[in-house]
Regions:
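Conserved class I S-adenosyl-L-methionine
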Residues: 3-44, 59, 63
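Conserved beta-strand signature within the Rossmann-like core of class I S-adenosyl-L-methionine
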Residues: 148-154
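Short conserved loop adjoining the S-adenosyl-L-methionine
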Residues: 111-116
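Short alpha-helix
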Residues: 170-185
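A short glycine-rich, Lys/Arg-flanked "PGG" loop and its adjoining helix->strand segment in the class I
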Residues: 135-146
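A conserved beta-strand element that flanks and buttresses the S-adenosyl-L-methionine
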Residues: 123
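Class I SAM-dependent methyltransferase SAM/SAH-binding core
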Residues: 51, 57-110
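Core SAM-dependent methyltransferase catalytic element
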Residues: 194-212
Length: 212
């Protein structure tokens, strides 16, 4: 499998930030993610340290701000400066619990600028498809504290996924590889398939896992 360099990947999202943001704003992905999180609240403590690794234009960050019941410190990380700017603007425009604190960091998801065991919850979407799974998941495991949770949305192979692969120049990992590599670093709690009437289910599934 061919994996793109960080510079190559970020250039794609620098060029297509507006399209990416528009597409995910209107395709119902955000509603589906929020529905799941409201029905299945993440077990985060008050003051939880949360990392959105590869936040893009803020899809998961915004969902967390709306559904987390306890105050949290959210760090949104992306390699694309333009995506971070878009995420920051989106957060400013949305109403959310003012007890949440949020910061933005430009960094590479395979060399995160944080010490080991820095976060209680790590969320990510649209990042691991650009990386060798063992490398990407290993780095997320490194910064996640023991007992902490990983919430991610792997792209699953499908006809709709093939179009996204062409547009955004990534390659979906085989589901078996996702499962095996996740189990190397985490205890899998749930592998969730979205209902077929929700567009997110055409291209993504959801994995919740815990670091031992």
């Amino acid at each position: 499998m061919l994996f793109r360099s960080p510079d190559s990947s970020v250039s794609i999202y620098e060029r297509f930030t507006s399209l990416y943001d528009l597409m995910f704003r209107f395709n119902g992905y955000a509603r589906s993610i929020e529905r799941y999180l409201r029905e299945n609240p993440l077990p985060t403590p008050a003051g939880a340290r949360v990392l959105d690794a590869g936040c893009g234009t803020g899809l998961l960050t915004l969902a967390l701000l709306r559904v987390l019941k306890r105050p949290a410190e959210i760090t949104a990380v992306d390699l694309s400066g333009r995506s971070l700017q878009t995420a920051r603007r989106a957060v400013r425009k949305r109403t959310h619990d003012p007890r949440h604190k949020i910061s933005y960091v430009r960094a590479n998801a395979v060399s995160l600028p944080f010490p080991d065991d820095s976060f209680d919850l790590v969320v990510t979407s649209g990042v691991l498809e650009y990386l060798p799974l063992s490398e990407g998941l290993g780095e997320l495991a490194r910064v996640l504290a023991p007992g902490g949770y990983l919430f991610f949305l792997p792209v699953r192979p499908s006809p709709a996924t093939r179009l996204l692969e062409i547009m955004f120049r990534f390659k979906a990992h085989p589901p078996r590889a996702v499962a095996e590599n996740t189990q190397r670093f985490f205890r899998v709690i749930e592998h969730y398939r979205f209902p077929p009437h929700e567009p997110i289910g055409w291209t993504k599934s959801l994995v919740l896992a815990q670091k031992s």
